[in-house]
Every structure is written in C-alpha cells, then in structure tokens.
Regions:
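Structural signature of tandem-repeat unit edges
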Residues: 1-7, 17-29, 39-52, 62-75, ...
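Consensus positions within tandem repeat domains that build extended binding/scaffold surfaces
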Residues: 9-14, 31-36, 54-59, 78-80
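Acidic, glycine/polar-enriched metal-coordinating patches/loops
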Residues: 84, 105
Length: 118
C-alpha cells in the first residue's frame, strides 16, 4: 500500500478469503468492518500512528490468533475482536492507553481473549 495512505476505508478487506496475514504501515484510521469475516487470517499488525479502530474493524475472523496494536490508539469501537479465535492474543504496549482501551472492549466477550503487555 502507498506510504501516503492514511485511512483504510470501510469494508476494505471484508470477506477476504485468501488473506492470511496483514501488516499495514502509515495509517491513522481503520474504518468500519475493515477486517471482517476473513476466515484464514491469523495475524494482524497495525502501526504506530494509528489512532482509531472503527466499528467492528477487526471482527468475525475465527482463525485470528494474534493482533499487534500500537500505543497511539485513541478510539477502539466496542464491537472489535468479537467472533475471533478462542484464545486470541492482543499484543499491546504495557501501561499504554491502548492497553486500557482493549481491556474495556474485551470485558464482555464470551470467549478467552488475552491481553499481552509488551
């Protein structure tokens, strides 16, 4: 993706059946349903500078085992991380606002999600 890209629009990877790993650099916003219903994806790495995860931006990815989030997140919609793999690990910078936001989002999930401070 071009370095100048700052926003991943709504539904950018919706239902991407071949997507196995996603590492995006330089973005500030992920729109709604960006990584939704991607059955083969296992890992997502998002860059420092990312400020917002939209509604259900990462959801319904049953084989997703690891998400790496930056310290710069200011907003994470409450519907993120739902319907992903049991045992999902969300890697966050220890003590960051991102860690606080993620812990709040996962409070009501009905399966095992682990926050991994690094």
């Amino acid at each position: 993706m071009p370095e100048s890209l700052k926003i991943i629009e709504d539904q950018a990877f919706l239902g991407a059946t071949a997507l196995r790993k996603l590492e995006i650099n330089g973005i500030e916003t992920m729109g709604d349903y960006c990584i939704y219903g991607c059955p083969k994806i296992k890992e997502v790495r998002l860059p420092e500078g990312l400020k917002e995860l939209g509604e259900s931006a990462i959801e319904n990815c049953e084989n997703l085992t690891d998400i790496y989030l930056p310290s710069t997140l200011e907003t994470i919609d409450e519907y993120n991380f739902d319907l992903c793999a049991d045992g999902l690990k969300i890697h966050v910078p220890a003590g960051s606002n991102t860690e606080t936001l993620v812990r709040k989002v996962i409070e009501n999930l009905e399966y095992n999600v682990e926050v991994v401070p690094e």
